[in-house]
Amino acid sequence: MPAMVEKGPEVSGKRRGRNNAAASASAAAASAAASAACASPAATAASGAAASSASAAAASAAAAPNNGQNKSLAAAAPNGNSSSNSWEEGSSGSSSDEEHGGGGMRVGPQYQAVVPDFDPAKLARRSQERDNLGMLVWSPNQNLSEAKLDEYIAIAKEKHGYNMEQALGMLFWHKHNIEKSLADLPNFTPFPDEWTVEDKVLFEQAFSFHGKTFHRIQQMLPDKSIASLVKFYYSWKKTRTKTSVMDRHARKQKREREESEDELEEANGNNPIDIEVDQNKESKKEVPPTETVPQVKKEKHSTQAKNRAKRKPPKGMFLSQEDVEAVSANATAATTVLRQLDMELVSVKRQIQNIKQTNSALKEKLDGGIEPYRLPEVIQKCNARWTTEEQLLAVQAIRKYGRDFQAISDVIGNKSVVQVKNFFVNYRRRFNIDEVLQEWEAEHGKEETNGPSNQKPVKSPDNSIKMPEEEDEAPVLDVRYASAS
């Protein structure tokens, strides 16, 4: 049979003119192969060689004008048949573009990004939260002894002019390393005019005692130079009548005295003393204006009251005369006393920090509540039947609590108050409960014999209801006189 040639499909409208030579060459090769099939074996071999050369020439002729764009593939089958497939590279790009939509714009909500609405209030709140974030400047360390810490603070104050808070902040910055902190102290200049509330109160108190004698004031504020005291005095002098702590305290005391006097007058009412005072006032009004003695006395009293109010320290500050005399007596003694007080203040602040740290740790542990640490409650159901152990336990509870049925019920655990009362009635004779109660009354007195006032009296033995287990159980020996017999 003649060999069948499979021709690859062509795309219509693309390169038909160029493929005419390849088609004619393929047809010639096919006719040569058909004629060779009917000839002798020798002729068949010759014609096969000619056909193969013709097909090779056709392939080269087809590839030359197309510049490598068209390709021919021939494969020999096991039975001698051959097949060829041809395809074009130019058509592959167009088909892929058609499959993927041509690479155009993608329209639709699924291709768009979701942009949140602009909220200026939320933005301002976030910026405010960032601004309000605090920074930790000091935290105590257990590995650092108090003696080393006091020595470090003294060096920072005397040599470099740091106050206690600044020195501790530097130490915390270097992770509680004293050597690094001491080496870094000269590299910074502390703010010299930083006046805390305590410093301002001490200055006002010292100024009320010593006036403008600044070297005396410096004895109460040893970490301040005289130049700093003078500078603060002139800035404090301008606003003294408005913002002075001592003046506010004096005005407050004066207002409290006036209110107390008004309350006393309202409480007394129109009594004979008020009438006499009113008469005295009228008589004073009748005095000629030349006599101004009472007015002078009032002015003297008012000035004395003002002086007394100014001499008193502000609220929360206590000064004794001995301490003031010790500070004012000698400069060295004043420095020693103030240094001791400063050390005490440092130790107290350190204790406060340790307590705060301990409290914060305990609060972190209690974030989940106390339920994990609570012991499981054993809930026992009430049982109407009395075992031997429960009977003995009830008798011992009666010996201790008397007629307190609630306490006896709590001791037993699985018996209610009503069941305890029934036990009193049903087992009175068996356990000699009357004698046990008499012993309890003799020990605690007769005032508590009736038990709590909200409990009802126990029924008499005549009206008692016998429990079924009383008939079934064997007689039990007396608890107080238990013997082998």
Swiss-Prot record:
<dbReference type="Pfam" id="PF01448">
    <property type="entry name" value="ELM2"/>
</dbReference>
<keyword id="KW-0945">Host-virus interaction</keyword>
<feature type="compositionally biased region" description="Low complexity">
    <location>
        <begin position="74"/>
        <end position="95"/>
    </location>
</feature>
<dbReference type="GO" id="GO:0045654">
    <property type="term" value="P:positive regulation of megakaryocyte differentiation"/>
</dbReference>
<feature type="modified residue" description="Phosphoserine">
    <location>
        <position position="460"/>
    </location>
</feature>
<feature type="region of interest" description="Disordered">
    <location>
        <begin position="244"/>
        <end position="314"/>
    </location>
</feature>
<feature type="region of interest" description="Disordered">
    <location>
        <begin position="1"/>
        <end position="26"/>
    </location>
</feature>
<dbReference type="GO" id="GO:0003682">
    <property type="term" value="F:chromatin binding"/>
</dbReference>
<dbReference type="InterPro" id="IPR001005">
    <property type="entry name" value="SANT/Myb"/>
</dbReference>
<feature type="modified residue" description="Phosphoserine">
    <location>
        <position position="260"/>
    </location>
</feature>
<dbReference type="GO" id="GO:0006325">
    <property type="term" value="P:chromatin organization"/>
</dbReference>
<dbReference type="GO" id="GO:0005667">
    <property type="term" value="C:transcription regulator complex"/>
</dbReference>
<keyword id="KW-0156">Chromatin regulator</keyword>
<dbReference type="GO" id="GO:0019899">
    <property type="term" value="F:enzyme binding"/>
</dbReference>
<feature type="compositionally biased region" description="Polar residues">
    <location>
        <begin position="450"/>
        <end position="463"/>
    </location>
</feature>
<dbReference type="GO" id="GO:0030218">
    <property type="term" value="P:erythrocyte differentiation"/>
</dbReference>
<dbReference type="GO" id="GO:0010629">
    <property type="term" value="P:negative regulation of gene expression"/>
</dbReference>
<dbReference type="Pfam" id="PF00249">
    <property type="entry name" value="Myb_DNA-binding"/>
</dbReference>
<feature type="region of interest" description="Interaction with HDAC1">
    <location>
        <begin position="78"/>
        <end position="257"/>
    </location>
</feature>
<protein>
    <recommendedName>
        <fullName>REST corepressor 1</fullName>
    </recommendedName>
</protein>
<dbReference type="GO" id="GO:0035097">
    <property type="term" value="C:histone methyltransferase complex"/>
</dbReference>
<feature type="region of interest" description="Interaction with KDM1A">
    <location>
        <begin position="296"/>
        <end position="384"/>
    </location>
</feature>
<comment type="similarity">
    <text>Belongs to the CoREST family.</text>
</comment>
<dbReference type="GO" id="GO:0005654">
    <property type="term" value="C:nucleoplasm"/>
</dbReference>
<keyword id="KW-0832">Ubl conjugation</keyword>
<comment type="subunit">
    <text>(Microbial infection) Interacts with herpes virus HSV-1 ICP0 protein; the interaction leads to the disruption of the BHC complex, thereby preventing the BHC complex from repressing transcription of viral genes.</text>
</comment>
<feature type="coiled-coil region">
    <location>
        <begin position="244"/>
        <end position="273"/>
    </location>
</feature>
<feature type="cross-link" description="Glycyl lysine isopeptide (Lys-Gly) (interchain with G-Cter in SUMO2)">
    <location>
        <position position="122"/>
    </location>
</feature>
<dbReference type="InterPro" id="IPR000949">
    <property type="entry name" value="ELM2_dom"/>
</dbReference>
<keyword id="KW-0804">Transcription</keyword>
<keyword id="KW-0539">Nucleus</keyword>
<feature type="cross-link" description="Glycyl lysine isopeptide (Lys-Gly) (interchain with G-Cter in SUMO2)">
    <location>
        <position position="297"/>
    </location>
</feature>
<keyword id="KW-0677">Repeat</keyword>
<dbReference type="GO" id="GO:1990391">
    <property type="term" value="C:DNA repair complex"/>
</dbReference>
<dbReference type="Pfam" id="PF20878">
    <property type="entry name" value="REST_helical"/>
</dbReference>
<feature type="region of interest" description="Disordered">
    <location>
        <begin position="49"/>
        <end position="110"/>
    </location>
</feature>
<keyword id="KW-0805">Transcription regulation</keyword>
<keyword id="KW-1017">Isopeptide bond</keyword>
<feature type="coiled-coil region">
    <location>
        <begin position="334"/>
        <end position="369"/>
    </location>
</feature>
<keyword id="KW-0175">Coiled coil</keyword>
<keyword id="KW-0678">Repressor</keyword>
<feature type="domain" description="SANT 1">
    <location>
        <begin position="190"/>
        <end position="241"/>
    </location>
</feature>
